[in-house]
């Protein structure tokens, strides 16, 4: 049997990449996954989905499913940290005053540009990711385990000095510095 080496190598690379991607998205056991669940959100579930979907959309609309899930995971890590508000909407809408000016945790929330959904496919995928993340159906294993709390676009140079975890798409993810 004859195999074209170039085609075979491309096929193997594609399969390897797919397996790695699937491994990153393997659901974490519900006991270990995000503490935010339908049962403890009650009537607020649809509001929490809306807030998380908006954050995913405005922070990562053009990213892959994994990139959107990564943004969702950081948001949920903050909810579960005890250092941020205890709800998704609280985390997403959090504002602080710095040197007399209002600063949002997620810059889109302080911008009027966020009022319009421009791409219905990206919005629908953002809602799907939000629902799956909130019900612990999926979790970004690496960012969940490493407790990623911050990220920025790869073209931004913040003055943070935090331990870098990884880059996913156009975002670089960080965790808080361990206390010694």
Residues covered by each model-derived region:
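Bacterial extracytoplasmic/cell-wall-associated proteins, especially those involved in peptidoglycan
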Residues: 2, 30-180
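C-terminal segment of classical bacterial N-terminal signal peptides
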Residues: 21-28
């Amino acid at each position: 049997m004859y195999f074209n080496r170039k085609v075979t190598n491309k096929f193997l690379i594609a399969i390897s990449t797919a397996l790695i991607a699937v491994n990153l998205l393997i659901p974490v056991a519900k006991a270990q996954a995000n503490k935010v669940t339908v049962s403890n959100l009650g009537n607020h579930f649809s509001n929490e989905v809306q807030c998380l979907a908006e954050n995913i959309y405005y922070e990562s609309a053009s990213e892959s499913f994994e990139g959107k899930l990564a943004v969702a995971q950081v948001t949920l890590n903050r909810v579960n940290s005890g250092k941020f508000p205890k709800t998704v909407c609280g985390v997403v809408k959090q504002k602080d005053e710095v040197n007399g000016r209002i600063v949002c945790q997620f810059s889109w929330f302080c911008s009027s540009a966020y009022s319009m959904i421009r791409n219905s496919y990206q919005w629908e995928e953002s809602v799907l990711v939000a629902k799956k993340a909130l019900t612990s159906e999926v979790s970004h294993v690496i960012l969940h385990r490493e407790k990623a709390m911050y990220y920025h676009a790869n073209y931004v140079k913040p003055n943070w000095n935090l331990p870098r975890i990884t880059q996913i798409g156009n975002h670089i993810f960080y965790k808080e510095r361990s206390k010694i």
